[in-house]
Amino acid sequence: MRRKIALFLALIFVGVSLVSCSSKKEAVSGDVVAVVNGEKITNAEYQQIFEQVKEQIESAPTYTKDIWNQDYQGKKFLDFVKENVLDSLVAQKLLVQEAKKKNITVTDKEVEEEYNKEKQFNSKVTKEQIREYLLIDKLLAEYTKDVKVTDEELKKYYDEHKESFEVMRARHILVADEKTAEDIYQRLMKGEDFAALAKEYSIDTATKDNGGDLGEFPHGVMVPEFEEAAFSLKLGEISKPVKTQYGYHIIKSEGITVKPFDEVKGTIESYLLNDKKNKVIKEKYDELVKASKIQKFPENIKVKVG
C-alpha cells in the first residue's frame, strides 16, 4: 500500500502539479490552507504531513540545514516542499472523497495491520492517515483493475529496446595518472598480456588480482564515461585511457550479449503495467479535478525548519 500511494504522490512531488484551482477565492479563516469541494484542510492537518516529509528529508545522509534555502527548480527548496505538500494534501482529500462516493470502505483490522507496518518507516503517521491511504489504495486498484499487458506488447518493447538488455563482460586497468595509463596502453598495443599488467599496475583492489576482470554488467551501472567507452568496444578491443572520477581506465571488451526475452519478460511486464496504470490514474484524477471546486490558500501555511 505504502509504495502505491508513494507512486501516485510522486506524480505531484516531482513538480508536475495535478491540481487546478478556482480563480475566485472565498473568504476563509487564517487556519485553512485549502478547501476541496467544501471540505477544509486546516493548517494543523498540513503541519502533520509537513513534519513527516521534513523528518524524511532531514534523515537523509546528505542533509544539511542550508538545504531549505537552496535553489530548486527555480525557487527555494522550502517553498517547493511547501507547495507540493499542499498539492498532495489536496489530492488525498479529493481521492478520499471519491472513494467514499463509491462506497469503498476500510476495516479497523486493515488499518491496524497497515499502521503497524508503516510506523516502522514513519514514526509520526496516524491511524486516520492510514485509513485515508487505504481508501485511496482501494480506489486506485478499482481504477486499474482491468489494465493488462499483452504478449505482443511485451515482445514489441523488447525488440525496440534491446540495447537496454545488453550485458557486457570486460576487464580494466585503473591507474591514478594519465602518463602511467598511456605507458600501459602502449605496452598493450605491442602485445603484452592485459591480465598480467592489471595485476601489476591496477589500483582497483577489487579486481586487480583477477586480472582486472569486472564480470558482467548492464547499462546504467558504471559511471557514464566508463560505460560509453566500454559499450563502444568490439570483442577483444582495448580502449585508450578513459578519465573518470576514479582515475584513468584502460578497458578491454570480452563481449556483449543481450539477455533473452524470457529472462527479462517479467521486468518488462512490471514496467509496462505500472506505466499503463499511472496513465489511467492520471486521467481519472484529471477528470476529478475538472469536476471539483478546489481553492488553495498557501499564505496561511505556517511551518518551521532548520
UniProtKB/Swiss-Prot annotation:
Biological process per Gene Ontology, one example term: protein folding
EC number of the protein: 5.2.1.8
Domain of life: Bacteria
First-listed, main subcellular location of the protein, grouped into a coarse class: membrane
CC terms in the record's Gene Ontology section: plasma membrane
Pfam families from the UniProt entry: Rotamase_3 (PF13616), SurA_N_3 (PF13624)
UniProt xrefs under InterPro entries: Foldase_PrsA, PPIase_dom_sf, PPIase_PpiC, PPIase_PpiC_CS, PrsA_foldase, Trigger_fact/SurA_dom_sf
Lipidation (S-diacylglycerol cysteine): 21
Location(s), subcellular: Cell membrane
Keywords (A to Z) from UniProt: Cell membrane, Isomerase, Lipoprotein, Membrane, Palmitate, Rotamase, Signal
Reactions catalysed: [protein]-peptidylproline (omega=180) = [protein]-peptidylproline (omega=0)
Signal peptide: 1-20
The UniProt record lists the keyword Isomerase: yes
Residue ranges of domain PpiC in the record: 165-255
Xref: PROSITE patterns: PPIC_PPIASE_1 (PS01096), PPIC_PPIASE_2 (PS50198), PROKAR_LIPOPROTEIN (PS51257)
GO molecular function, one term: peptidyl-prolyl cis-trans isomerase activity
Family statement: Belongs to the PrsA family.
Protein name: Foldase protein PrsA
Taxonomic path: Bacteria, Bacillati, Bacillota, Clostridia, Thermoanaerobacterales
